[in-house]
Structure formats: structure tokens, C-alpha cells
UniProtKB/Swiss-Prot annotation:
Top-level taxon of origin: Bacteria
Family designation: Belongs to the major facilitator superfamily.
MF annotations from Gene Ontology: transmembrane transporter activity
Location(s) in or outside the cell: Cell inner membrane
Primary residence: membrane
Membrane-spanning ranges: 5-25, 42-62, 78-98, 104-124, 143-163, 171-191, 249-269, 297-317, 325-345, 352-372, 390-410, 413-433
Record PROSITE patterns: MFS (PS50850)
This protein's record includes keyword Membrane: yes
Membrane topology: Multi-pass membrane protein
Protein name: Putative transporter AmpG 1
Pfam family name, one: MFS_1
Keywords per UniProt: Cell inner membrane, Cell membrane, Membrane, Transmembrane, Transmembrane helix, Transport
This protein's GO CC annotations: plasma membrane
Amino acid sequence: MLNNSHLLIIWLFGLISGFNLMITGNTLNYWLAKEDIALQTIGILSFITLPYSINFLLAPIFDAVQIKYLNKIFGHRLSWICLTSTALIFLIYIFSFLDPRTNLVLFTFTALIISFFSAAQDTILSALRTEIVPKESLGFTSGIYIFGYRIGMLLAGSGAIYLSIYFTFNEIYKIFAGLVFIYLILLIVAARYTNSFGLVEERICHSPSFLCHSRGSGNPNNEFFIKRYYSNFLKIFLDSRFRGNDIKSGNDISLAYFIILILIFLVLYRLPDNLINVMINPFLLHLEYDAFEIASVGKFWGVVGAIIGGLVGGFIMKHKNILNSIFLFGIIHALGHILFIFLEINGKNSLLLFITIGIESITGGMTMTAYIAFISSLCQGKFRATQYSFLSSMMGISRSIFPIISGYMVVNFGWQNFFLFTTIITIPSLLILLKIKTKLQ
């Protein structure tokens, strides 16, 4: 039975996940733009968030591997959280002394390592959340988690840009390190007080390794579990709802073709947003908006708009099926990108910025809601968690790899053509969606 203390822990999970993502994501992007780093370089550095795209590969390790000393004190899950949080505290503090203008290579490498530990912790927290929460309460607690996630994004995103009016980003990242430390203490205290982590310890497997030890003679099945997870990963994915009557032609070639279509769609559908997200900070600074305006409208209002869009999208999807919704939302959202062209033509205009960010964020929240619902609808059977992790990683690939060309596009073709491209590139994904729809009907 869940109580308020358990809900607080779920909220803390979301808070730190959203907070950590922004540290190496949009906030870092703003820092680089503020330091007048070349647009091409800013685009390339979008790959820093790549660990979030492959974190599903780490999941079996965190399930099976037991940390030698920390496990005796904190237990299995909490010991991993302590390890990753401690690493993040030290790495973020070290990062706060680096300057992207004088040593960009070391700056980038450190940010990538921070991103790795952030993604690792995100994986652990996601697994723990599903273990603490009863199945019938997952929907409600997901809302608590997402609320915490958005608050974390606001703190490390809009909050950091507000602080940049008074502090340097080196000082701000020192504050970040302190906040991660405070979070760790709060989580340890809350976990000990509620014994939430103890509820799932007996369900966790352990395995000996050079980083860990086993209780007694250990469990030799854990090494087999990890090897089996990786060797059969594609089989796990293929043995889903895609077999059988869900595809008109049930042969393997048709199955492979259908899966490829889905993967391409998942990458392309999110690509326009991901291109814009990498360049939005340089764009707003190019239009000479100050830190207060960017934090208030570009970030805070953007998050509020995304929340509103998620609610609107969820309401509409009660009356329309997922495929029709994701198609409709995609068209509306693509048209919203055109407003950035008007913003570039008109120059600095606070009202137009408010309207542009509002429409972009609300329609973006709608598409994201439908996108997640679509991924969830594809996952069935006993391996649905693995399927979901794999499919959602396509969103991460779209966010981390393809936007590396965004800076080159702006430099060579200009802002207006860049935003026009983000509108047009939606068309291929919608055509693929129509093809997927015919396959499923």
C-alpha cells in the first residue's frame, strides 16, 4: 500500500532525473551559446546526451551486479544510487572549473562522463519505481514522477538561466553539485524512514564480479542472465505483437520490413523538435533576448506549455485512436515551426516570442503524448519493458546523433531555411506512419 512517503520518493526520482538531464542538455547548450562557441560545434556536442539512448543496455548489469561494500550498508538498489550520485557530485564539481573556450576537448569529455552516470542513475530509478509501485498504481504514480521530472527540468533549466544573471556558469555548476548531494541525503533518509527499498531487495538478483561479491557462494545464474539478455535481445524484440495477425503478411521479410519502418518513423518523427532544441538557445541569443526573457518565456513558459499540451493530447486521444492522433498532432506541430520564421523576420518581439513558444510547446506536448502512447501500444508480452526501452531509445538517437548537423545547416543556409527544413522534414515521417497504419489494419 502506497502512502505519502512513498509518493515523495517517486517525486524525488522524477526530480533528479529531470535535473540531471538538463545539466548536460539544454543548460549546457545555453552555456556554450552564451560563450559564443561556434554553431557547428554546439550542434556536434548534442552527442553528449548519447548515453541516454543506450541506457537500456545497462539495465541487466544494475539488476544482476552487487556492489561489494555499499550493499552491506544500503542494500542493492540504494547502493547503486549512492555510487552514481557520488560520482555525479565529484564530476559536476570538477566540471565547474572547466572553460569551454580554453579546453573544449576536456570540457566535452567530462560532460559525456556526467551524462553516462546520469543515464545510469535514470535507469536504476526507473527500475526501482516499477518495483516499489504496485501495478494498479503505475498510472497515478507516473503523474507524480512526471511532475517531479518537470520541476527538476525547471530548476536546472529556467532556474540556471535566471541565476546566470548574477553568477557565472562555473559557479552555477558548483551549486548543481551541492544540490545533487542534498538530493542524495534526502533520498537516503526517505528510503530508510519508509523502508521502500527494502520492499524489493529480496526480488533482486546478485552476481559476483571484480566490483562485487556474492552472498555465500553467489548465484551463478546471474552471469547467464546477463549473457542471455544481450544475445537474445533482438529475439526478445521480435517476439512481440509484431508476429501473427498484426501484420497482413506474416513472413519474416515482411516482419523485418515492418520493424524497420517503425524504427525509422520513431527517429524521424522527433527529428524536427530535436534539431530545434539544439539551436533554440543560439537563435534566441541571436535575436538579442536577454537571460531573463529566455528563462521566463523560452524555458518556464515552454515547460508549462508542454504540460498543457500533454493534457490536451491525452483528452483528444480518448476520442481518437493513437495512429490518427499522432498523425494529426504531427501536422499541427509542424505548422507551428513556421512561427520561428516569422520571429526571425520580425526580430526581437516579446509578444511574438510568447505566442511562438506557447504554440510550439503545447503542440509539442501533444505530439510527445501520442508518441509515448504509440510506443507503449507496440509493446506486449512478458518482454514489454525491454521492448519499451529499446523503442524509446530511438527517441534518444534522434536527439543525440542527427542534430549534430544542425549548426552546419544554420551557418550554410540561414535561420529561415533551417526552420523551413524542420517543417518539411515532418512529411516523410507522416508518410511512413500511413504505411504503418495500413500494415496494422
